Every structure is written in C-alpha cells, then in structure tokens.
Amino acid sequence: QHTFRPNRSTHQVPFYWTFLLGIMSGMRTNEMCQIRCSDIRKEKNIWFMFVEDSEETRVKTENAIRKVPVHPQLIELGFIDYVVTLKKQKKERVFWELREERDGFASKVSRHFNERFLPAVGVWEKYTKVLYCTRHTFINKLYSEKVDENIIKMLVGHEKEFTMKHYGGDPFTPEVLLEEISKVNYSKINWKKLKL
C-alpha cells in the first residue's frame, strides 16, 4: 500500500491513476498519460473518457478513436472528483505534471512503473511485466466475462471498421457500454486501502 499510494506533494499522482485506469479502461499508456480534462465528460448522464486525435493528442490508429465509460470503481476512488477539481483549476491535462517527450507523455510513468513499482512488489520481469500489461489484463477480463467481442473492440480501439460495417453508426448505447465495462471486477483488491 505504501509503495502504491502517491505523495500528493511530489507530483506522483499520475503513478497512482494510470495503473488504475489501465486495469479498468484498457487504454494504451500514452492515451492515459495525454488525456485532457475536456476529454472526460458526460454523455446521457454517463461519464466517458474520449480518446481523440487532435493537435494536442495522438492516437496509434484511426481505430483508437473511441469513448470509454469511466468504470464505477474509478468513480468510487475519486477519479471524477479529481478531474472536476482540475477543471476548476483550469488545468488542460489530467496529468499536467507529465511533459511530452519524443514518444509522447508516457515515458516518466512507464519508467516508474517498470523500474520501481514492479520490482518493489516482487513481480518484475524485464520486458515482460510492464505497465502496458494492464491493457492486456483488462481485455482478458472482458473476455472472461463473456462480453460481446464487438463491444470489446470498441472499448479498446481494435478493428473499428469491422464493427461499423456490421452494425452501422454507433451500435451500442452508453448504457450498454457502461454495463459491460462494469463486469470487469478485481474482487481481491482492497479498494478502501487504496483510496486517496
């Protein structure tokens, strides 16, 4: 717990939230690290994170442009409250502490997770266990819960053209997307001890 929870005064908040976002949204590391406060907003009274291609943000492929419901556990942990506070402070990015480098905004967070956090908790394997594995974990959880494969592809930004070709337009409502992502559950985690 001490290893995982950040010290608010030392710009460590991104280390806390990016891991949680990874296991509960499946977003790519740079997608999480570059997300803007304006990208987190409600649609039909449901909170979403919009992954967009713009002058300020980059996506891996066109398929990566999507919207991901904010998992109820993230809301319970205070993620939306944190974002609302940042909006009041006129912050542009959620993780404003991070600076863009050659490969995007994720370098600092990835180094911390891969070189400090994982070795500290005893699960480090060079080039094998990395922050990006949270995305794989999320996808595996969706499959284990028998979530429709097309919904999985929409949530994680895979093969968007395939989905649209078969269904046309935006086939799944915000309510359906929230219901399906809520099936991702980590029952062995003591969330109360992790809340900031």
Describe the predicted segments one by one.
Residues 16-17, 47-49, 79-82, 131-134:
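Tryptophan-centric aromatic hotspots in well-structured domains and transmembrane helices
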Residues 38-50, 69, 87-89, 112-113, ...:
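Active/binding-pocket-proximal capping segment
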Residues 2-9, 25, 89-93, 101-102, ...:
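Short, basic (Lys/Arg/His-rich) helix/loop patches that form interaction surfaces
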Residues 34-77:
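Conserved tyrosine-mediated DNA breakage-rejoining catalytic core shared by Y-recombinases
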Residues 72-111:
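Major-groove DNA-contacting interfaces characterized by cationic-aromatic clusters
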Residues 15, 45, 64, 125, ...:
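Exposed loop/turn and edge beta-strand positions of beta-sandwich/beta-sheet ligand-binding modules
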Residues 156-190:
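Catalytic-site neighborhood detector that most strongly recognizes the C-terminal catalytic loop/helix
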Residues 1-29, 33:
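Basic, Lys/Arg- and aromatic-enriched nucleic-acid-binding interface segment
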